[in-house]
Amino acid sequence: MTCFQFEQIGVIRSPYKEKFAVPRQPGLVKSANGELHLIAPYNQADAVRGLEAFSHLWILFVFHQTMEGGWRPTVRPPRLGGNTRMGVFATRSTFRPNPIGMSLVELKEVVCHKDSVILKLGSLDLVDGTPVVDIKPYLPFAESLPDASASYAQSAPAAEMAVSFTAEVEKQLLTLEKRYPQLTLFIREVLAQDPRPAYRKGEETGKTYAVWLHDFNVRWRVTDAGFEVFALEPR
């Protein structure tokens, strides 16, 4: 068996501070903005010359938070309710022989200053600290295939849950808007995807959850109408 060695070229800075509630695919949370910081010796302006002319990028990265669990020949995709098993190569599961992922993100800006190269990204679906091993520009003529079929994932999942905020949290969000633009929209879009494990959907009203987004512990409860955010705790 041939082994290959790759070097990390950069690291992701993201509002997702833990893997819980990270969208299962890119593009589902449009307000999720973050950055890719290139590291030495790849943090050279010449290495990204011309990249600003592309609107979207493929980010190849390592599933660093799940790689110790090893790979599995079959997995249970959330889109199938978490009960049906599929071959790992027929899914985008993190439990792969080589823990490599790919994400299609929006490129908002390329910032180069001295020995710093930062790519500002949109529609991000990567956890903070994710190691990046490659960047490739997205080519619409070659990679957009409207006639392609995709089995159980032919279309994007519907944003399932209505999300509301208590009056106290709404006031808190207003005071944070200047420092955290689109924070309200970001929380709403993340929770609307219903990040709960498939087997826990349909639980009794009143069940509470929490997730670390930006610099806050966001706490919400299940209600008859959807999700209600009742606490925003600084971390």
Residue ranges and their predicted role:
Residues 1-45, 51-53, 140-190:
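Arg/Lys-rich, positively charged N-terminal/basic patches that mediate binding to nucleic acids
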Residues 2-8, 95-105, 214:
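Short coil-to-beta-strand transition motifs
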Residues 13, 105-108:
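Conserved positions in beta-strands of structured domains
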Residues 17, 109-116, 225:
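Short, conserved beta-turn/loop elements at beta-strand boundaries and strand-helix junctions
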Residues 49-101, 191-193, 200-204:
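Active-site-adjacent substructure of cysteine-protease-like catalytic cores
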Residues 119-153:
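Flexible glycine-rich active-site/ligand-binding loops centered on an Asp-His dyad
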Residues 217, 222-235:
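Enriched for short, Lys/Arg-rich terminal
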